[in-house]
Amino acid sequence: MVRSLKELINAAELNHGDDSEEIFISSGVSWLSYELLLAKLEDDSHYRVNYLDGVLEIVSPSIRHENVKTNLGMLLERFFYSKRIRFIPMGSSTFRNKAKKAGAEPDECYCIGERKDIPDLAIEVVLTSGKISKLEIYRRLGVMEVWFWERNQLKLYHLRDNCQNEQAIAYPDTYGYESITISELLPQLDIALFERCLTISDSIQAIDEFEQGLS
């Protein structure tokens, strides 16, 4: 299984295009195969690999995806500096829990205040939907807040369910997360301003408008 996945990548069947991104999904993948694949890909930060209950998802992000991800992180870190909020950026690090059969590589993630094993905030840029529930993965990992940037809109979720439960009891339709309009981790962040600046293609203009809105 791992060898065939590696051959798929080596054969460039997952392309790195400008506007399109590809998703490869395989079921019945063992945890060992998942970890072996991560080890094979450790020097290639381009791919995002997610795992849930034996289903493996490899995403090859488009250039547009990476542009949005970079701009999002850039603006958010400007907010942290402006408000003197201590943070630890963890980028697209791999987080996994063998006992809970879950693993993810977010587009961006952060610890707030101090370094932790699991980030407080995970952010996903969604241009193409996969079949794995990212919220269920993040619930099992214990990530407190998850943001999705989709169709020029930010969707925010805060964990209400006990991540130790086998299945979500609170807010089961959204895997234990409540949909929120204001970040509970970063209540000072003006979401409307953030969204508006993320749609500005010129990064300098986006930063200027965002910083003006912060002042």
Predicted regions and their residues:
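Short secondary-structure junctions
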Residues: 40-45, 80-88
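C-terminal interaction segment
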Residues: 2-19, 74-78, 85-141, 148-215
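Polyampholytic, low-complexity intrinsically disordered segments
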Residues: 1-50
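Short amphipathic alpha-helical segments
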Residues: 30-33, 64, 68-71, 130
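A general boundary/transition motif marking the beginning of the first structured unit of a protein
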Residues: 22-26, 60, 64, 195-202
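Nuclease catalytic cores
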Residues: 53-56, 61, 65-73
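Short Gly/Ser/Thr- and Asp/Glu-enriched loop/turn motifs at secondary-structure junctions
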Residues: 51-53, 90
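His/acidic/aromatic-lined binding-pocket segments of jelly-roll/cupin-type domains
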Residues: 49, 146-147
